[in-house]
Amino acid sequence: MQQAGSPTPPPSRAGEGATQVRSPGSDAPRAPAATDAGNGTAPAASTSRHDDYHRASARRLLLIGVACVLLVTLLLLDLTTGPSGMPFADVWRGLKAGPNGGDLDVATILWQLRMPQTLMGALVGACLGLAGLQMQTILGNPLASPFTLGFSAAAGFGAALAIMFGGALPIPNFVVIPVSAFIMTMVACGLVYLIARLRSASPEILVLAGITVLFFFQSVQSLMQFLASPEVLQQIVFWLFGSLLKATWTSVTVCALVFVACLPFIMRDAWALTTLRLGDANARSLGLSVDSIRQRTFFLVALLTAAAVSFVGTIGFVGLIAPHTARTLVGEDHRYSLPLAAIIGAVILVGASVFGKFISPAAVIPVGIITAVAGVPMLFTIIARRGSEG
């Protein structure tokens, strides 16, 4: 019972508890729980998304690291296999001794024969993997590759032309053939670009122009094979098989210079290529110059393809398999898929070289044949997946 004159406590309002909840064993009042769902969950959701992004990035970097380890392993394995046979201990001693040290026979086999072929396989595979991923991105076609636009057929025509008539020039064939193949590849690039510019640089126009150039160079190449003598025909067919046996330190240097020169421009456009996967309309709405990026990428693809096929011949399916494998592992972010596609392309070609030496040590099977045979099941898998998704 209250005494007269004492103040009456105000009635408690909704949301204002008259009694404070104290933690057990303590006189300090517990902080009131947040009741605003928006203020309480937004920071947590943002932190969760941030953590998910970092976990995904770490996973992608881990996969790239694993691919690098696999590539180094295959490079060493490729150096230890060959018709002459060489144990790993001799290879390791030869690598440490250098090209001018140690056993002369080991140094000659390792540094003058096997090393250029192994490095050339890695470089050509990396070029084709990068070119294939860029080609599929700018064309929006999962079955596109560096050969879709006729670049490979043009290189084959240039090589056949040099083999047939290069003897009339006072220049060695090992110089004339790759130079002619490179020039004809860039001519094909110019033809496709010219045809596309007559209408627009849309993916459909580029593909149609590429198919036109492809059939043109294939038909002329077939005519040259028909008219060639048996000896010349044998040389043309062997070049078209795609073999690393033609690799030299000069060809390795040229291919490496082209690859290193193109790589900064490719990685600079990684975000633009990722945006392009959203479609032309969405890319334009985000401020991307779609035609400019497509033309620039198109030229880089031509350079990479020319550097790859001019020295070793036609090698198929690497530019198709490597991009799909990279996208499956790391997704559409080209900051990760571009380097991974290059590494996977190198892994495929060096692995094909190792496999060819294992199954036929006396006469090494050209890597172009092995990649073509291995690429057929992959192509069927891609078609089946597209059919189930569509």
Give the ranges of each region predicted by the language model.
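Alpha-helical transmembrane segments in inner-membrane proteins
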Residues: 2-9, 13, 19-21, 25-390
